């Protein structure tokens, strides 16, 4: 169990990450924003959410992108750009790593039993 102050820090960082999914945030930037060391942010966040802030942010981005792929006709590259990816292949790799299939396969409605069902909650 983590001290309440560390839980609160992790929750504040998580909320901030959710509000800034379109940005590329580093742990150093989070440390500066929250007045804590990068080590404290990483350990607190990992203790509460079971993953690093970077992995959490990536999961949030990919699940947001997955929703847009299914609900809009926007291009994969356009959606990638909304979430801070200017390189389609890097976006596709991140999407595949998190969701389990390529963006195009996901959009086409492939049977996705092994796909990650939802983003980690804050």
Model-inferred region functions:
Residues 4-8:
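Short helix-capping and inter-helix turn/linker motifs at the boundaries of alpha-helical repeat units
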Residues 11-19, 24-29, 47-86, 108-122:
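Terminal helix-turn-helix DNA-binding modules in bacterial transcription factors
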Residues 29-36:
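Long, charge-rich low-complexity segments
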Residues 33, 82-83, 98:
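Residues within the alpha-helical elements of helix-turn-helix
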Residues 37-38, 86-87:
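Short coil turns linking two alpha-helices in DNA-binding domains
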Residues 40-41, 45, 90-91, 95:
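Short hydrophobic/aromatic patch on the recognition helix
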